[in-house]
From Swiss-Prot:
Stretch list, region C-cys anchor: 360-377
Post-translational modification remark: Phosphorylation results in its inactivation. ADP-ribosylation at Arg-125 is necessary and sufficient to activate P2RX7 and gate the channel.
Gene that this polypeptide is encoded by: P2rx7
Glycosylation sites recorded in the entry for this protein: N74, N187, N202, N213, N241, N284
Protein family (similarity comment): Belongs to the P2X receptor family.
Localization per Swiss-Prot or TrEMBL: Cell membrane
Protein name: P2X purinoceptor 7
Pfam families for the chain: P2RX7_C (PF20478), P2X_receptor (PF00864)
Gene3D superfamilies: atp-gated p2x4 ion channel (1.10.287.940), atp-gated p2x4 ion channel domain (2.60.490.10)
PROSITE patterns recorded: P2X_RECEPTOR (PS01212)
Gene Ontology biological-process annotations: apoptotic signaling pathway; ATP export; bleb assembly; calcium ion transmembrane transport; calcium ion transport; cell morphogenesis; cell surface receptor signaling pathway; cell volume homeostasis
Length: 595
């Protein structure tokens, strides 16, 4: 029993066998596809710098806003409204925020002189009452400004609300002033300091480099590297109106993108600035009005703590820093090249698809007969036969049958179920072409006295004439030389096969049958060709000659070794061979499955 594994199995190499087709058309297609793939791979390699190892950045941001705004607002004192002018500088309109953000106030509402005491609630929707029963003592509504005392008191001459303990007077629900009080904030400027680090490449840089003009202002075309931005220009870049946004406020994003090439031969690492609005300007303004928040300024008056509540509207600027730094890495280059090598197989896939399509049965039966222009494509059938070797599954039911009066071979892949093999219809299979180089290996006795084309001995197999039938010849026999099978009843149908489909001359009467199948000299030569020291005497030699004759007939009539393995010999040929090389006991086993 052979070993299941050995060192010889380890030290071996397997490769594919290819078929080279000499064709101008397919050669042109191959090189066009190869050059297309090569151009794409090269372009992607250089344009996207796929030979580099990419590293994300680590960033820190610091901002400084500069500018002064004059504010004019209406102030009511003692029932008299008057205009008050004021100045807002950086400390007034900017508030510290966490993270990479800063806030610029553009509008506001004030509630001055608030102190903790009892007062009526502001009569907003759902807050009015008619009696004390509409108020609950100790109730704290999340939408309320304080804690209810349980009393319903007048807010003004027409409306009554629940009394609350809160910062009084309660904040009024006024609309934001139009136009915005700090509408001149569009002229403010902001300086953005951005430091970045690529820890994987051990590289650090920033957006403000030595020698930069500190009095510059950012412009997308004329000064794209300046880190000082005018707020109005930021809105103008994205098509927004600063005056409109300043009324209710909003959220703006300042994007800083770093695409750094850290290779020494083409070093470049500069930021690219862009802007976008981050809040939804189409949201229902009655529910979500812009961006605002409240803060208070506390003070004491006559020993009492008071505050001024400010509802600030403005623009929050979020600075978003992202990007990568790339540097040449041999491993990345090798990985990219390896991943793109499979693209060159596109030519093979396309050409194989063309060959398989034009060699299909549909093209052969429908396209070529009706389209004269497509006839040259029939050469793909030849390419297909050279490229592909069809293999039929070697099942126990597989059998091949050849009739001397038909040009093709029949493949029978079914159970006979008692029906004679002569009458079973199978699938037509083209007869393989004979390799005439094999004829040179035949015995010398086959080379003398060759039949001349046209002589009667060559044409006799094609004549259809009445043949005297043997007394023992069964009904399915067409040549008159077949004999009944000796096999059991369940296997007998396998040997019920004649050499002809229609009545005519038997193939065993041909001269070539005698020279190839029955010639003892030829068969002995074949046996010695395989075993040079074989003893050609004794009882066992007849068995070897008989099986060699079976194989010689199968190889002669079926050509293909795969078909010969499953070939069923006609009854007339089988009995002719058995009579020439008989078995001592006279009992024969019949066809055996080879696998």
């Amino acid at each position: 029993m052979p070993a299941c594994c050995s060192w010889n199995d380890v030290f071996q190499y397997e490769t594919n066998k290819v078929t080279r087709i000499q064709s101008v058309n397919y050669g042109t297609i191959k090189w066009i596809l190869h050059m297309t793939v090569f151009s794409y791979v090269s372009f992607a390699l250089m344009s996207d710098k796929l030979y580099q190892r990419k590293e994300p950045l680590i960033s820190s941001v610091h901002t400084k806003v500069k500018g002064v705004a004059e504010v004019t607002e209406n102030v009511t004192e003692g029932g008299v409204t008057k205009l008050v002018h004021g100045i807002f500088d950086t400390a007034d309109y900017t508030l510290p925020l966490q993270g990479n953000s800063f806030f610029v106030m553009t509008n506001y509402l004030k509630s001055e002189g608030q102190e903790q005491k009892l007062c009526p609630e502001y009569p907003s929707r759902g807050k009015q009452c008619h009696s004390d029963q509409g108020c609950i003592k100790g109730w704290m509504d999340p939408q309320s400004k304080g804690i209810q005392t349980g009393r319903c008191i007048p807010y003004d001459q027409k409306r009554k609300t629940c009394e609350i303990f809160a910062w009084c007077p309660a904040e009024e629900g006024k609309e934001a002033p139009r136009p915005a009080l700090l509408r001149s904030a569009e002229n403010f400027t902001v300086l953005i300091k951005n430091n970045i680090d690529f820890p994987g490449h051990n590289y650090t840089t920033r957006n403000i480099l030595p020698g930069m003009n500190i009095s510059c202002t950012f412009h997308k075309t004329w000064n794209p590297q300046c880190p000082i931005f005018r707020l109005g220009d930021i809105f103008q870049e994205i098509g927004e109106n600063f005056t409109e946004v300043a009324v209710q406020g909003g959220i703006m994003g300042i994007e800083i993108y770093w695409d750094c090439n850290l290779d020494s031969w083409s070093h470049r690492c500069q930021p690219k600035y862009s802007f976008r609005r981050l809040d939804d300007k189409y949201t229902n303004e009655s529910l979500f009005p812009g961006y605002n928040f409240r803060y208070a300024k506390y003070y004491k008056e006559n020993g009492m703590e008071k505050r001024t509540l400010i509802k600030a509207f403005g623009v929050r600027f979020d600075i978003l820093v992202f990007g990568t730094g790339g540097k040449f890495d041999i491993i990345q280059l090798v990985v990219y090249i390896g991943s793109t090598l499979s693209y060159f197989g596109l030519a093979t896939v396309c050409i194989d698809l063309i060959i398989n399509t034009y060699a299909s049965t549909c093209c052969r039966s429908r396209v070529y007969p009706s389209c004269k222009c497509c006839e040259p494509c029939a050469v793909n059938e030849y390419y297909y036969r050279k490229k592909c070797e069809p293999i039929v599954e070697p099942k126990p039911t597989l059998k091949y049958v050849s009739f001397v009066d038909e040009p093709h071979i029949w493949m029978v892949d079914q159970q006979l179920l008692g029906k004679s093999l002569q009458d079973v219809k199978g699938q037509e299979v083209p007869r393989p072409q004979t390799d005439f180089l094999e004829l040179s290996r035949l015995s010398l006795s086959l080379h003398h006295s060759p039949p001349i084309p046209g002589q009667p001995e060559e044409m006799q197999l094609l004549q259809i004439e009445a043949v005297p039938r043997s007394r023992d010849s069964p009904d399915w026999c067409q040549c008159g030389n077949c004999l009944p099978s000796q096999l059991p009843e369940n296997r007998r149908a396998l040997e019920e096969l004649c050499c002809r489909r229609k009545p005519g001359q038997c193939i065993t009467t041909s001269e070539l049958f005698s020279k190839i199948v029955l010639s003892r000299e030829a068969l002995q030569l074949l046996l010695l060709y395989q075993e040079p020291l074989l003893a050609l005497e004794g009882e066992a030699i007849n068995s070897k000659l008989r099986h060699c004759a079976y194989r010689s007939y199968a190889t002669w009539r079926f050509v293909s070794q795969d078909m010969a393995d499953f070939a069923i010999l006609p009854s007339c040929c089988r009995w002719k061979i058995r009579k020439e090389f008989p078995k001592t006991q006279g009992q024969y086993s019949g066809f055996k499955y080879p696998y």
